[in-house]
Amino acid sequence: MTISLENTTVGQNPAGGPPTGKAPLDMEGLAWILFGASAFQYLNAACELNLFELLENKPGLTKPQIGAELGLADRANDILLLGATATGMLTVEDGRYQLATVLAELLKTDDWQRFKDTVGFEQYVCYEGQIDFTESLRSNSNVGLRRVRGSGRDLYHRLHENPQMEQAFYKYMRSWSELANQHLVEVLDLSGTSKLLDCGGGDAVNSIALAQANPHIEAGILEIPPTAPLTEKKIAEAGLSDRITVKPGDMHTDEFPTGYDTVMFAHQLVIWTPEENTALLRKAYNALPEGGRVIIFNSMSNDEGDGPVVAALDSVYFAALPAEGGMIYSWATYEESLTKAGFNPETFQRIDFPGWTPHGVIIATK
């Protein structure tokens, strides 16, 4: 069964600019792809320099005024404003600059900082490792990990040796989850759940949101030992140490704790191969009682294999960097793994989330 919270149609961008993924590609769209890395650097620079906040607070500034406010030399200011206007992030009329409508609206919401955290993740976690994307495809492995200092077997076991990257990573993961877990809280019926196991729960962002929305549940977070102190800190800050506990361990090599009637994988199964996902889901199946449920919550690509575009672009990171496998898999790929793990396809439920991120949930019952 599929539940769609919002139907959207992807078509040609009437204002020009990046291709939307459905209309025929023209030369302007191809040029956007060719110079896409440069377009992102304009976005990142504008975020780090707080250009957008400046124009939110002082709309209509002139070029010299913006340069003075940002402390930029004339040439540097010319470059920044050329890029910001050419990409459509700003508009200029009679020499006065304004925010694009989409940015002006986003800045009014709590999602603005989450968006900026996503920009920081792309800059400080993804960018360097994605240089090795082609070689990662050739070798079918995450070659970009070689650019991250440390000896851990994957990115997650190296983050603690790279403080700036670690900070950017966990800020992003919290923000990326928050962009979607408001919908998770709305649609996920946990009335029949008493104890939830959050596998790879990171800094507890999803367990905290679900516990706050469902006062009757308790949660355990299975997380690797280097991350466990951060997890415990976030739980304590939320005042939920009496209801959420950390279970240090490795979900691949350790047995799952028992006594839970729901197992959740949030933003985890995009990291590993389908075979590894099947093994994890089988461990969840074995740990669950009859009637217990498994929840897969992360970004999804469509079953046709042609989008959404954010799912496609996000897959570059998963191919090149974190672990030796992973991408934004399709709904059907997860359902195949669930079936191989022992779950009955007749129990599967798809929930497609609204918004610009391609998030969704699959629920299966033992």
UniProtKB/Swiss-Prot annotation:
Residues 1-12 have a biased composition (Polar residues). Pfam families: Dimerisation, Methyltransf_2. Its EC number is 2.1.1.304. S-adenosyl-L-methionine binds at residue 223. Keywords: Antibiotic biosynthesis, Methyltransferase, S-adenosyl-L-methionine, Transferase. C-methyltransferase that mediates the methylation of tyrosine into 3-methyl-L-tyrosine (3-Me-Tyr) in biosynthesis of saframycin A, a potent antitumor antibiotic that belongs to the tetrahydroisoquinoline family. Involved in biosynthesis of 3-hydroxy-5-methyl-O-methyltyrosine (3-OH-5-Me-OMe-Tyr), a core structure of saframycin A. Belongs to the class I-like SAM-binding methyltransferase superfamily. Cation-independent O-methyltransferase family. This is L-tyrosine C(3)-methyltransferase. It comes from Streptomyces lavendulae.
